[in-house]
Structures are given as C-alpha cells and as structure tokens.
C-alpha cells in the first residue's frame, strides 16, 4: 500500500476544502494510505511569481523540511506541483532533500496514471464535461500535449475522465488556451484577464459542456466568477471531485 502525503494548496485549504477531501477519498479508494502533515504551509508560488524570491525561499525550505521523509507527495494542483518541481532550484541551494521532494511530488492525475498505473477508473458520471487544461500542468508537467508542439495529442487527465461511464468529454475549438487567471496577472491586467476567461467559458458553453473541470482550483475559480456574473449555463468542479463522485 503506497503511503501518500497530501500537499494542499492555499486556494483549496481556504476556499475549496471539498477538493482536498475528494483527493483523499479517491487515493484511499485506489489503495493508498493517505496522511496530511499539519506543519505544511504555502509552497511560495505567489511570492515567487511576483518577484519576491527572498520571501518565497523560507516557504520552499519549509516544504522540503515537511515532505522530505515521504516517497510520494500528491497535490491537487498542477501549478503548485510545478512550483516545487521546476522552480525551487532558483530559491534553494542544491541538497539531497530538495532533489528528493522534487522527484516525489506529483499532481493528482499524474500520480494516478504514472505511479499507480491506473489508466481507467470504474465509475459513472452522466454529464457533458469540458476539460480546461491549465498552463502549468500542460506545459511544465506534461499532463497533456500542447497544440503548439508537433506531437501526437494526449492528456492524462482526459484519459481518466474518458474512461468514466456516461461522461462525455466535449470537443473544444481551442482545447489548451489559457483562461487568463495567471495569479497576479488577474490583478494587474484585470481587463485582459477577464476577456480571456470569457473566451474560454464561451468555448465550453458552445461545445455543450454542463460542467467544466480541471486540475487547478485557481483557474476554475476565475472562470466560475465570470460565468456566475453573466449567468452562463455551466458549472465548475475540480477533477478530484468528479473522479471521487464517479467512483463512490
């Protein structure tokens, strides 16, 4: 039985705790022993993205201290996972602990497919679903194939969803376009961010999606707020919630 430490991002902890609980339930159903280290804090991504490396470094050190004893760390966020794997080198000196946590930290769907070896989940979810492929997971973790690459298309997240009975993945005009959130980008470039988000929502609505899902609560939150203001006929749910509900 794999022993898995949950790393829960700030958005999930503060605003969407149901996503963390769904992640734990799904992993337990797949035979994992799930633990939650209570000393964990933010991964430091907001500070690093804003250019405050000195403020991000203590949080990166804390992450290494908390999680270096675990062989598997699972996070329901592509962007936070990518922060650990791809950007801690610029904040911390090289060490065995740093290298270990980089190797052992996985996004949820990535862990299910690549580590547990699960390609298909037994479950049912009778809805039309649109998949939003967030930028960090797609382009920094390789959860899918970006359209700008001349390579066979594929998506680990879409593969898991497509195997669920009754779940229909809708076809989008632009399947991997950014939603416009981008953390501080949504604050400093609010107008552009909102226009990008509305474009993504319109693509999903036109395709007939009842529910939009993805690996990052931040992107889903951004689009959900825009959709509710315009009363667009679509809901937003993290992929962990859909997979946990489908396999219940």
Q: What feature does the model see in each segment?
A:
Residues 1-248:
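Iron-sulfur cluster-binding electron-transfer modules in prokaryotic oxidoreductases
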